[in-house]
């Protein structure tokens, strides 16, 4: 059964401008430790890809927060929600801490799709209630 859906579109130029103003602090606020390591690696080699990586993570986390109905309120935090990828390349959401507990208590599962182009990143998220 569908528990919730969420979508988000992010202007990559806005993320770029925020990075120019706030530097790495912005990435540290939004990204998990694993995501931060990937962001740093990409940013060093291809600065534009680093910005788009941050924008896609921002977008996916916003879409997820809408799908679970919490928005950016506890237990939903930027760093407790990690966008990872399966061996196949498919994006996955990995939850940590109180958000993971909240999600598992409700027997939920999640599907996420992420895309980006030069100026925009977009995400769509479907959360299902599992009937075991």
Curated annotation (Swiss-Prot):
Keywords: Cytoplasm, Fatty acid biosynthesis, Fatty acid metabolism, Lipid biosynthesis, Lipid metabolism, Magnesium, Metal-binding, Transferase. Its cofactor is Mg(2+). InterPro entries: 4-PPantetheinyl_Trfase_dom, 4-PPantetheinyl_Trfase_dom_sf, ACPS, Ppantetheine-prot_Trfase_dom. It catalyses: apo-[ACP] + CoA = holo-[ACP] + adenosine 3',5'-bisphosphate + H(+). It is found in: Cytoplasm. It holds the Pfam family ACPS. One of its GO terms (biological process) is fatty acid biosynthetic process. It comes from the Bacteria. It is an enzyme of class 2 (transferase). Its EC number is 2.7.8.7. GO terms for molecular function: holo-[acyl-carrier-protein] synthase activity; magnesium ion binding. Mg(2+) binds at residues 8, 62. One of its GO terms (cellular component) is cytoplasm. Belongs to the P-Pant transferase superfamily. AcpS family. Transfers the 4'-phosphopantetheine moiety from coenzyme A to a Ser of acyl-carrier-protein. This is Holo-[acyl-carrier-protein] synthase. The lineage of its organism: Bacteria, Pseudomonadati, Pseudomonadota, Betaproteobacteria, Burkholderiales.
